[in-house]
Amino acid sequence: MRRIKPLSEDLIRKIAAGEVVERPANVLKELIENAIDAGSDRIDIFIEKGGKRLIQVVDNGEGIHPDDMLDCVKRYTTSKISSEDDLYSISSYGFRGEALYSISSVSKFSIVSRPEDLSVGKELYIEGGVFRSFTETGAPVGTKVRVKDIFFNTPVRKKFLKSERTEFVHCLKTFINYAVVNTDIHFRLYHNGRELMNLPPSDLKKRITYIYPELSGRLLELDYTDETGRIYGYISTDERFKKEGIVYVNKRPVKNRELRKIIKSLISEKFYVLFIELPPYFVDHNVHPAKIEVKFKNDTAVKNLVREGLKALETPFKKGVTFDYTVSQRKGSYGKEKVFDLLGQVENTFIVVYYDGDIYLIDQHVVHERINYEILMEDLREDGFIKRKILNRNITHSISELEKALIEDKKGTLERSGFSFDIDGYNLVIKEIPVFVSEDQALDIFFRILMDEDAETVDYVIGEIACKLSVKSGDILSDEKAKLILKRWFETDSPNLCPHGRPVYYKVSIDDVKKAIGRG
């Protein structure tokens, strides 16, 4: 029989670190939050190898007093709260007192800091949670934190880190989340010694367009207040700009599935930066150590605030209903003809069919995605590259320094996905595109592949393109269009699931219906 025994301090540290630090982007998040909480107006961030080799954050904030430096890396030590009541009136980003403890437990960690009232600074060095040195050093006012070789002492966790590019994309998203909202701070971001972003203080709209230059002149402002709180921000009017939107609650980037559902239902897939302001007691950030998830005292009131705010936009967004079938038709006949009765369309989402004694509710987007996926897979070359077509006129699109770096990092995947292109200064010049993509769709699909950290294989890319080319929930289908989709669906190799594994249909047995209403 195995006996129960207490864990070692070393193992406790590593387990605790896993709750806060899963990848380099988590480290970056915590360090940026600390720098902002320190009252900085300038923050420089240096990343190497996607954060796997180094993350360094330098700020000009108030610094840490030497007497507090040894305490700042202990668990549950913080200057930001002192009582339970403080949890319900939090104005700072950090408050749990776990971040530096966790980070220093799984890295080679150093912190140099100097308050304004002292002439010299102090440097603390910790390696894998073990104290190494605490020395006096020359330093400017502020704090510099260096995190090297993350997970060097936990090889299993290190093994699960993704590629340098994937980890950097996660770091980049984290950086953007905080750079967008903190417009009074001058941010600079470097990767592998190269400056990618230089964001001087500005207003919110300018900050967004500094980060995403292609949105200049293409942002719609929102500002709405009710008895619950306020929602404000900007929404892209550019249909081609397909990046994940950002939601802030009291200036903290958060994830809330229900809010995102509401937003998507009203503005479709457009990019947005939305801020929700609520009384502090209305929000519980203390749900998870990462503080990304959030709960509300009154979910319904917050949902209504978001819903009514978006409905109040001067230019309401309407879902488009154009969905030309742009890929080549499958070669050969349809095989054995399937006899079915098309009953109609429900909520512009489900095609309803009577077939072989049963009723089928078929998800129109999912079924079309399955058809497109199989047709596109037939257009692969033998070497695994997607076939290309030459454009009559090159597509030229201005790009930022950041996008330029990402394109260079992901050049191989983009080329395998059917794109041939050059970079001319800060212009992307596309010469060839996948055979099944129209010129109007080319830029959208190019940037979807670029910004999706999972888009490494051609199979995955084809799944994403099939999704993009397919009819959407909310599109109105003519009977002819619905019948064409159904005929093509019946001949697919895997009719039950879409490429992402979602079921295509739900079957209702007529016999079960008869039994339920007493006719069985």
UniProtKB/Swiss-Prot annotation:
The UniProt record lists the keyword DNA repair: yes
Single GO MF annotation: ATP-dependent DNA damage sensor activity
SUPFAM superfamilies reported in the protein's UniProt record: ATPase domain of HSP90 chaperone/DNA topoisomerase II/histidine kinase, DNA mismatch repair protein MutL, Ribosomal protein S5 domain 2-like
One GO term describing the cellular component: mismatch repair complex
Keywords: DNA damage, DNA repair
A single BP term in Gene Ontology: mismatch repair
Annotated TM spans: none
InterPro entries for this protein: DNA_mismatch_repair_CS, DNA_mismatch_repair_MutL, DNA_mismatch_S5_2-like, HATPase_C_sf, MutL/Mlh/PMS, MutL/Mlh/Pms-like, MutL_C, MutL_C_dimsub
Family of this protein: Belongs to the DNA mismatch repair MutL/HexB family.
Biological role stated in the UniProt entry: This protein is involved in the repair of mismatches in DNA. It is required for dam-dependent methyl-directed DNA mismatch repair. May act as a 'molecular matchmaker', a protein that promotes the formation of a stable complex between two or more DNA-binding proteins in an ATP-dependent manner without itself being part of a final effector complex.
Protein name, entry field: DNA mismatch repair protein MutL
Native source organism of the sequence: Persephonella marina (strain DSM 14350 / EX-H1)
Name of encoding gene: mutL
